[in-house]
Amino acid sequence: MKMENHTLISEFFLLDLSDDPKLQPFLFGLFLSMYLVTMLGNLLIILAVSSNSQLHNPMYFFLSNLSFVDICFISTTVPKMLVNMQSQTKDISYIECLTQVYFFNTFVGMDDVLLTLMAYDCFVAICNPLKYTIIMNPRVCTLLVLMFWIIMFCISLIHVLLMNELNFSRGTKIPHFFCELAQVLKVSNSDTHINNIFMYVLSSLLGVIPMTGILMSYSQIVSSLLRMSSTVSKYKAFSTCGSHLCVVCLFYGSVIGVYFSSSVVLSTQRIMVASLMYTVISPMLNPFIYSLRNKDVKVALGELFIRVAPCPSWINDIITKFILKNIRQNL
């Protein structure tokens, strides 16, 4: 097969989620709805945290950052997927592909980091409550998040620069619905040894280190809970981190359950399903998990709704009673 330099390649071709044309309208409507729900849910979390001074603490700072990352994460892949569902060619330009690789790796890395920082925040809140304000200093938290953003941007830039040196054949089809780095490397005509080493080393570090940090944090949390004599104290302590634990299980469970299954060779369909779980499903459910299990977030959302939405007085009265009820329960 004739090889062409990457500078001559103008586009790649992506796969559909389904080969059945009759399913395309249904899938388009489904993923468009999921995308809009994700955008709205995460935007509400950001607005609720930023508009309520009671939520200006490290835990909700990390939560608002996670919501921002989830908005960017799903916006990296789903809009192009929706466009291709309405297109006959299913193509993506070379520049668009590089852009997807860059931002996808950045945001998935930040998801890992933020979940780890939130686990550590829970650990400090439960195991060292008297030192919480000292350890989880707002300035330190801000610098930590900023530092990891810079690190992820640099790592993704290296991925893209290495990928930019590869050769591809004209009409190359990527076996995925978006440009995932591992799948792009598989279809290159060049030697991808260096690319693969860098990718697997970084993937291992970004997988093992955050997961180890989360497991260590929760092992200490469980140990502290077992030493508590009061049932009420145990419930309050667990409710502090219950939402985060659900999100961690959803994010890592979808990856571990599919990518690290007993199958030696993963089919293209399994890879796409795995990607949908943590690129679409997880960002969509995160706001619901945090708002349904967290009284502070529910109160903040209620107050935001009263200020923004022009509602009849009887609806505002119901929301106000709900807010007061949750405030009394938190006392």
Swiss-Prot record:
Disulfide bonds join 97-179. GO terms for molecular function: G protein-coupled receptor activity; olfactory receptor activity. It is found in: Cell membrane. GO terms for biological process: signal transduction. Pfam families: 7tm_4. Keywords: Cell membrane, Disulfide bond, G-protein coupled receptor, Glycoprotein, Membrane, Olfaction, Receptor, Sensory transduction, Transducer, Transmembrane, Transmembrane helix. InterPro entries: GPCR_Rhodpsn (IPR000276), GPCR_Rhodpsn_7TM (IPR017452), Olfact_rcpt (IPR000725). Glycans are attached at residues 5, 167. This is Olfactory receptor 1174. It comes from Rattus norvegicus. The lineage of its organism: Eukaryota, Metazoa, Chordata, Craniata, Vertebrata. The gene is Olr1174.
